[in-house]
C-alpha cells in the first residue's frame, strides 16, 4: 500500500517514550502540524482501530482537510462515565504494563491472540506507558456524551467494521443510530482486528479498494 499512498501512522503520545499526553486536542494539533509540514492537502483515507477510533473521531470533526474515506476497524465507541473511567484506569495500567513485564506473556489474557507479529508492539507500549499519561488520556476519552456529528456526505464514505465475535460488536447499534448514512460491514466469525492482524496484506488491499472504488471489495467473510 505504501507504494501507492503516502502512509502516515501516528501513535498516541501515551505509548511514546519520553512524551507527555496533554489532551485529545493537543494530539490532534500535533497530527495537523505534521501534515502541514509535509505539505499534505488532502487525505485519501483515515483508518482507526480500537480506542484509536475515539481520537480519530475528534480529528474528523475538527480538521479542515478534505477526507476521501474513513475506515474504523473494531472501533472502541464506548460511552463511559467519568467515575467508571477513574476506577478502570489503574486496572488498565497494570494490564498494559504486564505486557512489558511478562515480555508479552499476558497478551492472550487481554487479546484473543498473542501472535509474534504483534507482540513487540504491545511490549513496547507497556514499556513506555506511564500512569500519568494514561490517566490523562482516559480522562478525556470514551466520554459519556453523544457522538460528535459527521456530515451526511462523510458518513456515506465511512465504514464502521466489526467482527461478529468481538466484544466491541456491542457498540454497533448505537453507532448506526448516530450515523445512519454510514456503512456497517460485519466480518462473520472474526474477532477484534483479526483480519488486520492475520492478513495485513489483504487488509491493506481492502483499504485501497475502498479508496479507489468507493465500496467494499467482495470478501467471503462479510455478513450478507
Where would I find each of the regions flagged by the language model?
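Flexible "cap/lid" loop of the alpha/beta hydrolase fold
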Residues: 61-97
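Conserved alpha/beta-hydrolase catalytic His-Asp/Glu region
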Residues: 82-83, 99-152
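Conserved serine/cysteine hydrolase catalytic core
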Residues: 136-177
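Catalytic histidine-centered segment of alpha/beta-hydrolase-like enzymes
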Residues: 190-202
Amino acid at each position: 500500500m505504501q507504494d501507492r499512498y503516502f502512509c502516515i501512522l501516528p501513535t498516541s503520545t501515551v505509548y511514546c517514550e519520553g512524551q507527555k499526553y496533554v489532551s485529545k486536542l493537543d494530539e490532534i494539533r500535533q497530527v495537523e502540524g505534521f501534515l502541514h509540514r509535509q505539505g499534505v492537502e488532502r487525505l485519501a483515507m483515515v483508518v482507526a482501530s480500537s480506542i484509536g477510533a475515539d481520537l480519530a473521531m475528534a480529528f474528523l470533526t475538527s480538521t479542515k482537510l478534505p477526507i476521501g474515506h474513513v475506515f474504523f476497524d473494531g472501533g472502541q465507541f464506548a460511552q463511559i462515565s467519568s467515575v467508571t473511567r477513574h476506577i478502570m484506569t489503574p486496572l488498565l495500567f497494570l494490564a498494559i504494563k504486564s505486557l512489558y513485564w511478562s515480555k508479552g506473556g499476558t497478551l492472550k489474557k487481554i487479546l484473543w491472540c498473542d501472535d509474534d507479529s504483534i507482540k513487540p508492539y504491545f511490549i513496547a507500549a507497556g514499556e513506555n506507558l506511564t500512569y500519568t499519561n494514561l490517566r490523562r488520556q482516559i480522562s478525556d476519552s470514551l466520554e459519556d456524551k453523544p457522538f460528535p456529528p459527521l456530515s451526511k456526505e462523510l458518513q456515506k464514505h465511512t465504514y464502521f467494521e466489526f467482527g461478529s465475535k468481538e466484544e466491541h460488536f456491542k457498540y454497533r447499534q448505537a453507532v448506526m443510530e448516530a450515523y445512519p448514512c454510514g456503512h456497517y460491514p460485519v466480518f462473520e466469525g472474526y474477532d477484534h482486528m483479526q483480519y488486520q492482524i492475520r492478513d495485513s496484506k489483504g487488509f491493506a488491499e481492502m483499504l485501497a479498494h475502498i479508496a479507489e472504488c468507493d465500496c467494499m471489495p467482495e470478501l467471503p467473510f462479510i455478513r450478507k
